[in-house]
Amino acid sequence: GLMVKTLDDVYEPSRRSLNWLKLKKDYLEGLGDSFDLVPIGAYHGKGKRTGVYGAYLLACYDEETEEYQSVCKIGTGFSDEDLQTLSAELNKHKIQEKSSQYNVSDVLECDVWFDAVQVWEIKAADLSKSSAHRGAIGKTGEAGRGIGLRFPRFERIRDDKRPDQATTSDQVLDIYYNQDAVKGQELDEDDDEDGI
């Protein structure tokens, strides 16, 4: 990110100030990566989010295996209205257990599973190799490691796309390898920041 400050302010360690702001590429229009992902599961909300889903598990689509591979757990970017609407809509598509088409680590077991029926546009700061997420699993060059999104944020529903038209695992892998941080040096391993 880029640090922006007022001209007359001085830096004070361990102190937050509205005079010093960090500007991240995913907050600027046209910068940052955007993904079209499928919500395949959810986690019950707590506190302010009681009665709706507080976070969702999203997946990319692998064309070779015809499976949905988890790439992020997301809980940010939603308005209160979004949370109500999405919970109500996805409740119509609940399934009893995780689909055999879903490649998800046991550590990400959801409270509720859904049929693959929607596509959401998601912005993310970066991608990293992950032992928890399964995006492009088997293609990363490391056994048991997939690709996960860092700091994912909900943007909107993509009504113009079917789930099998979501961002593919190959696209996720290409975006991962085209990051400046990966071209130069690796991001910290397992630095999945789900934003919740």
Give the location of each predicted region.
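Catalytic cores of nucleic-acid ligases and guanylyltransferases
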Residues: 1-196
